Amino acid sequence: MTQHDRQQFKNSLIQSTKYFKIKLENEPIFNWNDTAVGSKAITSEGKTVWLRIQCGNCDDIKNNHTWSGEIDASSLENILKSNLIDYYNWQDKDVCWRALLLSYIDENFCSTHPILTDSKFLLSVKWLDELKKNLVVLSKYKTNRISITQEDVDKKIKKTFNIQVDTTITNWVTIHGDLHLANLTYPSLYILDWEVWGNGPLGYDPALLLAFSADNFDVVDKIREVFKDWLLTREGKIVQLFALAEVLNIAKFDSQFSRLEKPIEQMSKKIMNELVEKN
């Protein structure tokens, strides 16, 4: 993202404060890949809120479910997440903008990046148990939104690993679809950033969290233990392989993730050997 792009995001934040009648409380905070910006703010009644700005090409977003993800997620109940208060849309030439006013979560992010930025960070089993409870609740929601398809699973595994095994998934549920440590808070759990949620394979969320944490063996072991009924079945291993393939492809082309490449390759090889043995 260029400085000009960042300035446009900042200008949009200021523009949105006038619409919502709020006052920014801190400098704008960009997400890890610079696709959105947010800031803590105060309403005229003195309530603390979070203002988030996102944008996209107007033609591209017409059939892109990520554009409506946060708004659609406002229907989800009994899940620890931020709540949508209001939103505001506008268009500037061929770019569509959206400002989302969300409830403020007064917790720390587990990490400022999908991979751990603090080598001493430890997740507790209690926290992971709470995460699982929330994912179970989410899994039971009915939605027309699609996060991952069978075709996605088949193509990604075949292209990345060229393994000849049946990759059919039969257990499809509603998932978050982008579960990593930059979208989770600690010590109290909240699940953030709901752009891509929808139908997907059971176990994908913890599998993706595991893949992004591949170089932290303590975190990996705890995720596998808490989610063993989802991850250690045959289908669970297929889902793990798919998530590992996704992150491995990122690691090969983005230096920010390069340290994950070796541990993911080791994990993937072990899972492939297990799948071939049982095939």
Where are these regions (language model features)?
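Short Lys/Arg-enriched alpha/beta "domain-start" segment
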Residues: 1-33
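A glycine-centered beta->alpha junction motif in the catalytic cores
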Residues: 56-57, 90-124, 140-144, 241-258
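Active-site Asp-x-Gly
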Residues: 174, 185-229
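Active-site beta-strand-loop-beta-strand hairpin of nuclease catalytic cores
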Residues: 42-49, 185-190
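Conserved kinase catalytic-core helix
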Residues: 69-81, 101-149, 177, 270-274
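A conserved long alpha-helix in the C-terminal portion of kinase-like catalytic domains
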Residues: 210-279
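Hydrophobic, aromatic-enriched interface-forming segments
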Residues: 126-188
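A conserved alpha-helical element in kinase catalytic cores
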Residues: 6-19, 50-98, 119-129, 133
